[in-house]
Design a protein with these regions (language model features):
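Ligand-binding beta-strand-loop-alpha-helix segment within the catalytic cores
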Residues: 5-26, 87-210
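Active-site beta-strand->loop->alpha-helix modules in alpha/beta enzyme cores, enriched
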Residues: 169-186, 344-653, 659, 691-692, ...
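Histidine-anchored nucleotide/phosphate-binding helix
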Residues: 69-97, 418-440
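A conserved mid-domain beta-alpha-beta active-site/ligand-binding segment of alpha/beta enzyme cores
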Residues: 666-727
Length: 775
């Protein structure tokens, strides 16, 4: 394989270090341990190429993916000739190379939303200017950029006049305009198309892109070349698909915006126009594993845009181990190398049931011997499948155990994570009166609340103030002490009106809490100041562009709305406000590159909570790196550090840690030791509590790329799919004929891992390894 695709000196160094012995994919790949190291590999290869091509043409990505590429490139350039820099260079094939000069390179912008003002911080134009032109010291004069403000339109107008609602109707390319505005819009679309052709020509006039670095989307998109893009596509104005819009929602302030925003993107043929080009796709985390496998193991196909790199002898995928886990090479290595453990038996048998579409009891010894993985099981026999069945039954039995006399502390990175992960298990725990329960959300979660939601809520708050429906503000002591009292009453009032289906009173309950939050944040002393503050916040939000970072006080207000939502969910089960803890860890800032958790700022508050609650069981999200929002992963790091610190002063030998997952990433059956049956009633409780309580999330402004709707629907589908996998092994009759009603009524399953502290900290040590290479 590699004889056709010669590796550079840098690539040889990383390939040797990776320990990968076999590459059988259609495009070569290099694998590293973690996300920061992926940045190091990419930075080293980039600087190696620049040293050989000081006047070359480069195209680099935007978003979160290049965070460590940017940091490592800057680190190496700043430390090229000192001890720190030399050590890295000599280790990774840059030892003999002189420090590259970057100011003669030509930079090509990959893509941009359209229309979007170039002055907005969430435009890619702003990003590439900040991190690449200024950050790397590239030539602004040579750069080929996409500035939406400068693209000529009909009659010399600005896009805000031509497309006043920022929506571009591409059907005007083919149909007759219906009015004068549509005539101008049609002419403008033709002018944009002309501009895109000229942009493509400018790239080709300089010989095409020599070094392309890009990420890959959940649907496999490269730049904004989504699934189905023509292999010979060029720079164009185009629509995107739902998966791409869901990913872009975070940049643009919600799916309501991203679904209506077009993009200008270079094409797949633009990327491979120069046959000598180095074309690299980077992918981190297990959530990308499926699309990475399809992109690397499928022949050239418009369904998988990244397959276009097969045209380049210098085409590569750079992956973290997580992103490569589903590759046939990785699966072969998993089964063929190292000690055979029970997990391999379980996984291979369950996968064989899926592969053959057969129930477990119908799998014959001949089937096991014919499969390339199950045939490796030691002491393979007629009883092998039965042993796996018994193992899964034991996990289900554990999920049916009734826990008593426990102090439960359920934690989540964001509001709704706990509910979406293990609500059916929690309801079992809460129905036992000897158990005490606490809930804690570790970040403020403000980025999930849209400006529109806050504006609408504040408008309604003004309405109830004007109508005398917020009586609490009339009490003499409200602005001195009253605002801190009766928070449980807000919650009870809200839920009572969920029951009575009184939408007005429900909204009024939310506004009561918003008034309390405003008094706390803005230190309001009277009713007039309250009105002024509401008007001021509405004004700030109305004058913000979608996706703009909010001022700190508005961030806090959004966070406190989410905190109220969380209190509402657990109040369904009689949990009081004082048992719902809001930690607001400081690393969560809403910036594009968030900080790492800090021992004092982020770990200490968790330790203090542990001491205060003194739990016997702690639940947490056990998501691998890069499997979804990196907040999950960072909260896990901080929690692991807190457990370790707490263990220095208390005997934690009896403490149990529950590791769960939800909508961003899911467990496979072999990865867990507890399986909890989920009834239709459990699903209804989760769906109803989500719809009634997570008010800011019901419209799914920041959806999963897997579903255009509420996260609760995604969670329910995962539970149902998990049952399907286990039913294939155990048989449907196992469930509907079971002696326990809980199992007979199950139409979904929740998976989680129950660990002691030692097992959890061993997992945490693996996590620590995955941040080696952090700068």
């Amino acid at each position: 394989m590699l004889s056709k695709y010669p590796l550079s000196e840098v690539e040889k160094s990383f390939f040797k270090e990776s320990g990968v012995e076999k590459i059988s994919t259609l495009i070569p790949y290099l694998q590293v341990d973690n996300f920061p190291k992926l940045g190091l590999l990419t930075a080293c290869r980039f600087l190696e190429w620049v040293a050989a091509n000081p006047e070359g043409v480069i195209s680099l990505p935007t978003g979160k993916s290049p965070e460590f590429f940017i940091k490592w490139t800057q680190f190496l350039l700043e430390n090229w000739d000192n001890k720190k820099g030399k050590e890295v260079r000599e280790k990774y094939g840059l030892g003999a190379i002189k420090k590259p000069v970057l100011n003669d390179l030509t930079f090509v912008q990959i893509d941009e939303f359209y229309p979007i003002s170039s002055s907005q911080k969430n435009s890619f134009y702003d990003y590439v200017n900040k991190f690449y032109i200024d950050g790397f010291g590239l030539s602004r004069e040579k750069a080929i950029l996409i500035n939406s403000d400068a693209i000529p339109l009909a009659n010399g107008l600005h896009f805000s006049k031509v497309f006043p609602d920022l929506k571009v109707d591409l059907s005007l390319r083919f149909r007759d305009p219906q009015n004068d505005l549509e005539k101008i819009q049609q002419e403008s679309i033709y002018l944009i198309d002309q501009w895109c052709g000229e942009y493509e020509q400018r790239i080709r006039d300089v010989g095409g892109i020599g070094f392309f670095l890009g990420g890959i989307g959940p649907d496999g998109h490269i730049a904004f070349n989504t699934r189905g893009s023509h292999i010979f596509s060029v720079t164009r104005l185009t629509e995107t698909n739902f998966e791409t819009q869901a990913v872009a929602a975070g940049d643009l302030g919600g799916i309501e915006v991203s679904a209506n925003r077009l993009v200008i993107t270079i094409g797949l043929d633009t990327i491979v126009y120069n046959p000598e080009a180095v074309g690299i796709i980077i992918a981190a985390g297990e959530a990308k594993a499926g699309i990475v496998k399809d992109s690397l193991e499928t022949k050239l196909s418009n369904v998988y845009p990244a397959t276009v790199l097969q045209k380049l002898k210098n085409g590569r995928f750079y992956l973290t181990k997580g992103a490569g886990v589903r590759l046939t090479d990785s699966m072969d290595a998993y089964y063929e190398k190292g000690q055979w453990i029970w997990e391999k038996t379980e996984r291979s048998v369950i996968d064989l049931c899926k592969k053959l579409g057969k129930y477990g009891h119908r799998i014959k010894l001949a089937d096991l011997k014919a499969d390339k993985y199950t045939k490796l099981i030691p002491d393979l026999s007629e009883d092998t499948v039965n042993q796996v069945i018994k193992s899964i039954e034991a996990k289900l039995a554990k999920g049916l155990e009734q826990e008593t006399d426990q102090v439960l502390l359920h934690t989540g990175p964001h509001h709704d994570d706990i509910s979406l992960g293990i609500l059916p298990h929690i309801t079992n725990q809460l129905y036992e009166p000897s158990n005490g329960a606490h809930f804690s959300v570790l970040t403020s979660g403000f980025t999930a609340v849209t400006n529109t939601f806050v504006i609408d809520t504040l408008q309604f708050t003004k309405k109830i103030l004007d109508g005398g429906k917020a009586q609490m503000v009339n009490y003499e002591d409200f602005f001195s002490v009253g605002y801190t009292l009766k928070t449980d009453k807000d919650v009870y009032h809200f839920l009572a009106n969920v029951a009575s289906e009184n939408a007005f009173e429900r909204q009024r309950g939310l506004c009561h809490r918003v008034i309390r939050a405003l008094v706390i944040i803005y230190e309001i002393k009277n009713k007039n100041q309250l009105r002024e503050t509401i008007n001021e916040v509405i004004s700030v939000l109305r004058n913000s562009y979608d996706g703009e970072k909010n001022p700190a006080k508005i961030q806090k207000l959004k966070g406190m709305i989410r905190e109220f939502e969380e209190e509402l969910v657990w109040a369904h089960f009689g949990v009081q406000v004082k048992n719902v803890h809001h930690l607001r860890l400081g690393f969560y800032t809403g910036d594009i590159f968030t900080e790492q958790p800090d021992k004092t700022r982020d770990v200490e508050p968790i330790v203090e909570m542990f001491k205060k609650v003194n739990p016997t069981k702690i639940s947490l999200t056990l998501d691998p790196e890069g499997s979804g929002p990196d907040t999950h992963y960072k909260v896990l790091q901080a929690t692991a550090a807190a457990v370790k610190k707490w263990g220095e002063e208390k005997d934690l030998s009896e403490l149990r840690i529950i590791g769960y997952r939800n909508v961003w990433f899911k467990f496979e059956p072999h990865e867990v030791n507890v399986i909890v049956p989920v009834s239709l009633g459990d699903m209804s409780v989760m769906e109803d509590s989500f719809a009634n309580c997570y008010l800011s999330q019901v419209n799914a402004s920041f959806p999963s790329y897997a579903h255009n709707g509420k996260f609760s629907t995604v969670a329910k589908r995962i539970w149902v799919n998990q049952l399907d996998a286990i039913q294939l092994l155990l048989g449907k009759n196992y469930f509907y004929l079971h002696e326990r009603a809980k199992v007979r009524s199950s139409h979904g399953l929740v998976f989680f891992r129950d660990m002691n502290v030692e097992e959890f900290l061993a997992t945490a040590r693996e996590l620590e390894k995955s941040i080696e290479g952090m700068l």
